[in-house]
């Protein structure tokens, strides 16, 4: 009791295409007011910590957190995830918080802080329309849109660089997008994204100009 590794297996997918389909499917399970208030967790006191499940790779935690903070709902951080605390199944997932800051992953913490600032600064990331744009075996892209503000989130979950060429959806040719996570710019050409390659196991949060 309390071990949830078998909970909702239909929502877990190892492919980008399946993952994006599941993200869209979840949005239709409940009325939108409920969706926007739902608590979105990567882990909790009842589960192994995400960082441990993924073999201690902070890149994967960053990717998951990027989705968590750009998906409809209320992202919730389990204490210590932001500094790299690990832990297996309950009770190991309830380790004491490491108050000694020399034990923290400060780059990871800064990444969490950046996502928090961006979500607070841009209402489209909180309550905007969710539009799937494209997917492949190891990558997904979706758009959040509200009152003319558009943001495109791209996830590269492969061990190789990924050139973003997905369809740009409602974005017009000539649109330039700036990655708010610092990886450069993309543009829209002939209805598709161009001009930006993501390093392995990284994501982009692109703001349309």
Locate predicted features.
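Conserved alpha/beta catalytic core and glycan-binding cleft of carbohydrate-active enzymes
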Residues: 1-92, 120, 130, 134-137, ...
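Aromatic- and carboxylate-lined catalytic core of secreted/periplasmic carbohydrate-active enzymes
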Residues: 97-133
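Short hydrophobic/aromatic beta-strand or adjacent loop that forms the aromatic wall/cage
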Residues: 137-139, 149, 200-205
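Solvent-exposed beta-hairpin/edge-strand motifs
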Residues: 168-183
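C-terminal beta-strand-rich structural cap/linker in extracellular carbohydrate-active enzymes
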Residues: 188-209
């Amino acid at each position: 009791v309390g071990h949830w590794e078998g909970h909702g297996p239909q929502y877990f997918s190892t492919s980008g295409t399946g993952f994006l389909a599941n993200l869209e499917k979840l949005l239709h399970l409940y009325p939108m007011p409920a969706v926007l208030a739902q608590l979105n967790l990567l882990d909790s006191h009842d589960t192994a910590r995400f960082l441990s499940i993924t073999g201690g790779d902070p890149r994967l935690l960053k990717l998951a957190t990027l989705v968590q903070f750009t998906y409809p709902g209320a992202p919730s951080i389990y204490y210590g995830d932001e500094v790299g605390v690990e832990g297996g199944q309950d009770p190991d997932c309830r380790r004491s918080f490491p108050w000694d800051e020399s034990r923290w992953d400060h780059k990871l913490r800064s990444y969490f802080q950046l996502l928090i600032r961006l979500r607070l600064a841009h209402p489209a990331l909180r309550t905007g329309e969710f539009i799937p744009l494209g997917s492949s075996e190891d990558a997904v892209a979706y758009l959040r849109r509200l009152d003319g503000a558009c943001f495109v989130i791209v996830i590269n979950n492969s061990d190789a660089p990924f050139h973003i060429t997905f369809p740009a959806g409602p974005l017009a040719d000539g649109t330039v997008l700036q990655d708010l996570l610092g990886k450069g710019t993309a543009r829209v050409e002939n209805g598709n994204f161009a001009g930006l390659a993501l390093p392995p196991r990284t994501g982009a949060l692109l703001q349309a100009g």
